[in-house]
Amino acid sequence: MKVLALRHSVAQVYADTQIYTHDETKDDYENAFLISNLTTHNILYLNYSVKTLQILNKSGIAAVEIQEMDELFTLIRCNFTYDYIDDIVYLHDYSYYTNNEIRTDQHWVTKTNIEDYLLPGWKLTYVGYNGNDTRGHYNFSFKCQNAATDDDAIIEYIYSNELDFQNFILKKIKERMTTSLPIARLSNRVFRDKLFKTLVSDHSRVVNVGPRNESMFTFLDHPSIKQFSNGPYLVKDTIKLKQERWLGKRLSQFDIGQYKNMLNVLTTLYQYYDMYHEKPIIYMVGSAPSYWIHDVRQYSNLKFETWDPLDTPYSDLHHKELFYISDVTKLKDNSILYVDIRTDRENTDWKAWRKIVEEQTINNLNIAYKYLSTGKAKVCCVKMTAMDLELPISAKLLHHPTTEIRSEFYLIMDIWDSKNIKRFIPKGVLYSYINNVITENVFIQQPFKLKTLRNEYVVALYALSNDFNNREDVIKLVNNQKNALITVRINNTFKDEPKVGFKDIYDWTFLPTDFETNESIITSYDGCLGMFGLSISLASKPTGNNHLFILSGTNKYFKLDQFANHMSISRRSHQIRFSESATSYSGYIFRDLSNNNFNLIGTNVENSVSGHVYNALIYYRYNYSFDLKRWIYLHATNKAGIEGGRYYEHAPIELIYACRSAKEFAKLQDDLTVLRYSNEIEDYINKVYSITYADDPNYFIGIKFKNIPYEYDVKVPHLTFGVLNISDSMVPDVVAILKKFKSELFRMDVTTSYTYMLSDEIYVANVSGVLSTYFKLYNAFYKEQITFGQSRMFIPHITLSFSNKKVVRIDSTRLNIDFIYLRKIKGDTVFDMTE
């Protein structure tokens, strides 16, 4: 949902939009809670409170102040990610298709012939890093830029088996127009940029597990971050390959040679970062014009020095000349060298050309060896061709996508590799590598071992759920890693499947109860965003591809009502109960009936079950930004930090009742996952709360009324307002609590409206209006370790007779309290009080 804050109402009506006017009788937190549970996508928030907007944004719900109608029109028609700290709106708006254009934030693409293969009459537009160049389109009171591009489709095309780009991009645009927007992917780059800038400033050592190409720009400015990936393809790994011949295959209609060069250099750069944790000088020989340097410059101040007879416009220092092996002495330490020398073939005879290529390959290799033979802190990437070669067994092979698969590949070596054992590799084996292997990632660092790192902050986004990881080892890492942000796939199945298929792999599934964490926040993507200064206009949907975000060691853990809080906890319930269910009271009715409380009068205002916990369990797929386990634990240990607002603390028994209702709901729905989750949450409640039951009571609290509107034959009809199991020495403690609650007890609006047979020969009158105070009293006794209440649900009633009587119904009648007392069962009254 998105909240657009206005000072005045607007005349225009928008689809899927609701108006909410700030309620001055309620505080900012309660207003935020009410807004978050509205069911429409767009909320126009009138007479807004800035504090309420802050609360929503911290909860991951995008809430933006609107000053002009243009701002309203722009934000209401598309989704966006909001940086609420720096007041920047990142639109995810594809309406630019109506201008017959596709967009890119990678400058190199604009220098290709891609426009020859677009839809008729279409053009390509460069919009800069995260759409930064579009800011001029929006003259708003907040910074605004459109981060939507088609780079995902362009890159997917490059790695696909499709050659016809026009058909491919047409298909992708149609998909985009007919399926739900994958907004988490769109906002992920904004999130990653913010995340790692924050972590690097707060932690001296940061580890990142499983980065992919979409992160290749994110880490350019963070050489200190240790990357773990799937490892490199080494020269020695070719021993598994059978010999093949030249294949020759076109991968792309438009020229992607620059993309290949960029990937080669970035792969080399991240190898250097992995070894030396600082930025090198980047030397490049050949590969002009290297327009992609402009893309790298958007993210980092890396320095480039280049050699090529052709211009390289974005180089810091360009030598418009050939580079010879004698020039290697000009290259400094603390650098990387990219050698991409190959003379254009033009009209040269094939055999003569092949001889030239092989000579240049040997020359390239000699340049690399000479560069690595002296000095320190050096990594080299060199262009090779398939031919009989001796190569270091530990050197890394690269074959990033290029326009046509021919005979070229690349080799990365560091100083140690260049001096390592060399092995003869036949030409046919290298052709086999070229024909069958595409390097899919610029990150080729070693795989991560699932072990706790003592002094590092570990980030593992979408990297650990794969079933080639041991599930118990993943759980152990989450439990024991002190500082971390780790994601795992949430169990969205209804049959409690331990793993699910995704693309061509299988992932383990998890629930929050799979983890034993006391100082970790377990939330959703949008809940996590709120903790890093971001919010989003479209909440996560239960697609089956959803992840739990687990933050360990965060200073926000105790800020219970600010982050990963209960905002939107009833939203799914509202959507169902007002559109699909038998009555809007269905949730209240079901919760009472499933706990054998059959008095449904006023059930919507006097419910005996925690609606928060019930909704968090049965609709966990729709709102898992609310960290239920943390909420339970912090209340149980009395450590919950509440910033403000009228905050109701549930008695532990209300939480137990909610689990019981959720379990019955799950059985009716045949939802085995909710059934397990509810059982495990109930076990967790019993673990963190020291709940004792007065199932063998020796004292009770009684309430005598001045008026009973029914006939009775018991001596003193009264309401048993709870039973206790205490020693006589604890009586003063009980009395002290009763005195503390005196005012609230006598203010209860107690009513009755019918009689019924509680069981055979026990004739009683119903009592309404006391449950809220009962649970508050329960909490007060619990905190003083006084055993109060039984394991079965408290159903308030007044016993009228120990015989069978006819049921009577009357108009709701107020019962006036005469006095309240504490009495020993089968004993004397030890305390009483009147108003």
Curated annotation (Swiss-Prot):
Keywords: GTP-binding, Host-virus interaction, Hydrolase, Inhibition of host innate immune response by virus, Methyltransferase, mRNA capping, mRNA processing, Multifunctional enzyme, Nucleotide-binding, Nucleotidyltransferase, RNA-binding, S-adenosyl-L-methionine, Transferase, Viral immunoevasion, Virion. GO terms for biological process: symbiont-mediated suppression of host innate immune response; viral process. The active site is at H718 (for 2'-5'-phosphodiesterase activity), T720 (for 2'-5'-phosphodiesterase activity), H797 (for 2'-5'-phosphodiesterase activity), T799 (for 2'-5'-phosphodiesterase activity). InterPro entries: VP3_Rotav. PROSITE patterns: SAM_MT56_VP3. It catalyses: a 5'-end diphospho-ribonucleoside in mRNA + GTP + H(+) = a 5'-end (5'-triphosphoguanosine)-ribonucleoside in mRNA + diphosphate; a 5'-end (5'-triphosphoguanosine)-ribonucleoside in mRNA + S-adenosyl-L-methionine = a 5'-end (N(7)-methyl 5'-triphosphoguanosine)-ribonucleoside in mRNA + S-adenosyl-L-homocysteine; 5'-triphosphoadenylyl-(2'->5')-adenylyl-(2'->5')-adenosine + 2 H2O = 2 AMP + ATP + 2 H(+). Its main location: virion. Interacts with VP1. Interacts with VP2. It is found in: Virion. Multifunctional enzyme involved in mRNA capping. Catalyzes the formation of the 5' cap structure on the viral plus-strand transcripts. Specifically binds to GTP and displays guanylyltransferase and methyltransferase activities. Has affinity for ssRNA but not for dsRNA. Capping activity is non-specific and caps RNAs that initiate with either a G or an A residue. Together with VP1 polymerase, forms a VP1-VP3 complex positioned near the channels situated at each of the five-fold vertices of the core. Counteracts the host innate immune response thanks to its phosphodiesterase that degrades the 5'-triphosphorylated, 2'-5' linked adenylate oligomers produced by the host cell IFN-inducible 2',5'-oligoadenylate synthetase (OAS). The host RNaseL is therefore not activated. GO terms for cellular component: viral nucleocapsid. GO terms for molecular function: GTP binding; hydrolase activity; mRNA 5'-cap (guanine-N7-)-methyltransferase activity; mRNA guanylyltransferase activity; RNA binding. It holds the Pfam family Rotavirus_VP3. Residues 246-428 are annotated as: 2'-O-methyltransferase activity. Contains a bipartite N7-methyltransferase domain, a 2'-O-methyltransferase domain and a GTase/RTPase domain. The C-terminus contains a phosphodiesterase domain that degrades the 5'-triphosphorylated, 2'-5' linked adenylate oligomers produced by the host cell in response to IFN stimulation. Belongs to the rotavirus VP3 family. It comes from Rotavirus A (strain RVA/Cow/United States/WC3/1981/G6P7[5]) (RV-A). It comes from the Viruses. Its EC number is 3.1.4.-, 2.7.7.50, 2.1.1.56. This is Protein VP3. Residues 171-245, 429-555 are annotated as: N7-methyltransferase activity. Residues 556-692 are annotated as: GTase/RTPase activity. Residues 693-835 are annotated as: 2'-5'-phosphodiesterase activity.
